[in-house]
């Protein structure tokens, strides 16, 4: 295996994980919902936050720039909310898009924090 191929191999693996995360998000958010009672804890917002944090982190580990990831995933989150308007028992919520955005920032922040820790450990 060439040195370049060795460097890119982990990124391909993370790209596969990111694609899997994306497919799970699309399936989970665009499948028709079921009526359910109001919840006292906002599990839905936590799910949005977690899913987009993981997607942002894995796409960053796959080698995409934060400057590409942030607007792309933000558009994805807003687009999903728009599509949910026409899906039975789904609805668009501004707070869902906000949870997506905060999750994206958290995922990118985790990547940045990890890189800083590695650099500091080399001092």
Tell what function each PLM region has.
Residues 50-66, 104-114:
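Membrane-interfacial alpha-helical segments at the cytosolic side of multi-pass membrane proteins
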Residues 54, 70-78, 97, 101, ...:
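Residue-level signature of the transmembrane alpha-helical core
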Residues 34-45, 82-98, 102:
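Interfacial helix-loop-helix junctions of multi-pass membrane proteins
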Residues 12-13, 62-70, 93-94:
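Membrane-helix interface segments
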Residues 118-123:
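Short, charged juxtamembrane terminal tails flanking transmembrane helices
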Residues 1-59:
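"…centered on the first transmembrane helix and the immediately adjacent amphipathic helix/loop
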Residues 31-32, 64, 88-89, 115:
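Short helix-capping/hinge motifs at transmembrane helix termini and TM-loop junctions
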Residues 23-32, 75-85:
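Aromatic-anchored segments of alpha-helical transmembrane domains
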């Amino acid at each position: 295996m060439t040195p370049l191929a060795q460097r890119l191999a982990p990124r391909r693996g993370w790209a596969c994980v990111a694609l899997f995360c994306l497919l799970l998000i699309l399936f989970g958010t665009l499948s028709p919902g079921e009526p359910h009672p109001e919840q006292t804890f906002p599990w839905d917002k936590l799910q949005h936050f977690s899913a987009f944090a993981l997607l942002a982190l894995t796409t960053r580990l796959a080698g995409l720039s934060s400057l590409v990831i942030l607007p792309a995933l933000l558009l994805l989150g807003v687009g999903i909310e728009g599509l949910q308007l026409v899906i039975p028992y789904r609805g668009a919520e501004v707070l869902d898009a906000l949870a997506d955005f905060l999750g994206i920032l958290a995922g990118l922040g985790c990547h940045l924090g990890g890189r800083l820790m590695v650099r500091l450990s080399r001092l």
